[in-house]
Amino acid sequence: FLMANEAVDDMLEFHWIIDMLQMVDVGIVVLDREFKIKMWNGFMESHSGKLPSEVRDKTLFSIFPDIKPDWFAQKAKPVFELKTRAFMLWEQRPYLFKFSNYRPITGSEEFMYQNIILSPLVSASGKVEHISMMIYDMTDIASGKKQLEALQVMQSEALERGA
């Protein structure tokens, strides 16, 4: 009887975790070695307009043709082979997924700036057959940095003019 209660508790905990993954304000995508999409959370659904059922088992590149397969495979290679994380920062590449900026009132940016982390998902056998992508919205930070840089330019121009 005690084992049955533990099993029920484990099932409930599993459902809570899945629920959190769906609702968190971060994009989560799980890819296999062929870059087929295995998981697509609510953040990705709401920003891409694509349901999990539409993208599951399709390659990332068939859903997002702007993503260059060779470039992405090069980024993912050490994640699969060395079990290390890889990073794509908005300062180097503003976005991977061209999502609209969903804060059009407060933001002047037309698209969402993103930081992306690729992480290995180690299976029970110890091999990495899947990787996760975590997509963070960096638009507010990017916009703030751009505004600060513009102010610094204006300030230095004013100083040069002797104002």
Language-model regions: role of each:
Residues L2-W16, A150-V153, E157-A163:
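Short, charged amphipathic alpha-helical "coupling" segments at sensory-output junctions
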Residues V8-H47, R161:
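Sensory modules in modular signal-transduction proteins
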Residues E54-A73, E81:
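PAS-family sensory/regulatory domains
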Residues E81-E129:
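Per-ARNT-Sim (PAS) sensory domains and their PAS-associated C-terminal
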Residues P120-R161:
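Sensory coupling linkers of modular signal transduction proteins
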